[in-house]
Amino acid sequence: MQVLVRDNNVDQALRALKKKMQREGIFREMKMRDFYEKPSQKRAREKAEAVRRVRKLARKRAQREGIVAR
């Protein structure tokens, strides 16, 4: 990953790098790799994440269509 440093402005470059890393999901991956995750736990987590994603999409679609379901 590469970030340009303009006018020796290191703070701005660090902010840009952090934003890029956040977008790429590097921080989340580092947190996940901190400890070993058993394959069965990984499958369960991924399945739960998929369910969460589907529900979130359905909520957004319903809200867009004017149907508010809670």
Curated annotation (Swiss-Prot):
Cytoplasm listed as a keyword: no
A single cellular component GO annotation: ribosome
Keywords from the UniProt entry: Ribonucleoprotein, Ribosomal protein
GO biological process entries: translation
Keyword check for Magnesium: no
Matching PANTHER family: MITOCHONDRIAL 28S RIBOSOMAL PROTEIN S21, SMALL RIBOSOMAL SUBUNIT PROTEIN BS21M
Family: Belongs to the bacterial ribosomal protein bS21 family.
MF terms (GO), sorted A to Z: structural constituent of ribosome
Record protein name field: Small ribosomal subunit protein bS21B
Pfam families named in the record: Ribosomal_S21
Taxon lineage: Bacteria, Pseudomonadati, Pseudomonadota, Alphaproteobacteria, Hyphomicrobiales
Origin species: Rhizobium meliloti (strain 1021) (Ensifer meliloti)
